[in-house]
């Protein structure tokens, strides 16, 4: 159970900190509204303008729809039309009407036609939050994405998600990814809440058991990202392209933080649903967090969390990405809620001090998305400021219980 009997002063109980988070969330939302395009939502530059040649991708559209839905549930006016715009895009130009599923972007915008589990997880998350927000057409989108996930991506045999297929589903990529399964875990927690079907919690546990307890547990709780279709690790994957934005070489401390939080959400969700939990969930979350801090934070002569590590836990890509630090703060908050231990309060404050000092851009809006190894603004991996999802969630998670999932928690749904 959550432990709120802290014997120390905690920012999680501070009304002033709650107010600061709320104001930062509203600031982020205000910046992101300019991302609207005909076919969904695109990427913004450093100054909040649509980037030159910006197109509406499924990932960004789904994430924005999810965020605006959460804001609407919070009671922030001005988001309803943006949710509906996202639903229309995900139900229209981003959707494959012939074969089912979702493209990476509309065909007229030259989107990739393969069907990726990663993108479908975000469509499911967006649809779930839009249903909680009570938006028209949200339920139809939710039913559609559930059918695709269950019939195409979910493998009962593997207890995990298949990675990707060709447009007509005839060819499958011989690869399994921890990243797509991580975001599927997040989506499954939301699906369990909006459908009332605890089967999604069993599926999420199956993923966590495979990716975290088995594979990461055997690797000192450093998350292995890349596998064959038979779930054999691929340690050299993308060695020649180590800074890939979605499939980088080595291990990614930011994902360890994200997994740590999701493991605790899963534990709380299953307890709330009356499902039994294995006794290793909390310990796995602790180990993930501890090793991400040990090997990722302040390891190259400057504060901040490096993007990637090699198999000897030495930095490879030393850039600091904003999403990594959002997830670090959110994971610290989750562990603090769960355990009541001061070490997590200390880390929580540490990460937010770093974020406020170096990532939050008061002058031009939103957050800088990337710093180099000297903690100077950089655009080597992520140009502009396209992302709302990570930073906005980082302002919400610390003030909400570990279960239910975000939109349902803000709506006060049991």
UniProtKB/Swiss-Prot annotation:
Catalytic activity: D-mannose = D-fructose
Keyword terms, alphabetized: Isomerase
Pfam family, one: GlcNAc_2-epim
Activation/inhibition comment: Strongly inhibited by Ag(2+), Cu(2+) and cetyltrimethyl ammonium bromide (CTAB).
Family annotation (InterPro entries): 6-hairpin_glycosidase_sf (IPR008928), 6hp_glycosidase-like_sf (IPR012341), AGE/CE (IPR010819)
GO BP terms, alphabetized: carbohydrate metabolic process
Its EC number(s): 5.3.1.7
Molecular function per GO: isomerase activity
UniProt pH dependence: Optimum pH is 7.5.
Biotechnology note: Shows high production efficiency and may be suitable for green production of D-mannose.
Entry note: thermal dependence: Optimum temperature is 40 degrees Celsius. Thermostable up to 45 degrees Celsius.
Residues annotated as catalytic: 255 (proton donor/acceptor), 390 (proton donor/acceptor)
Function: Catalyzes the reversible isomerization of D-mannose to D-fructose. Shows high specific activity towards mannose and fructose, and has no detectable activity towards other monosaccharides and disaccharides.
Subunit organization: Monomer.
Family: Belongs to the N-acylglucosamine 2-epimerase family.
UniProt-listed PANTHER family: N-ACYLGLUCOSAMINE-2-EPIMERASE
UniProt-recorded name of the protein: D-mannose isomerase
Source organism (scientific name): Pseudomonas cannabina pv. alisalensis
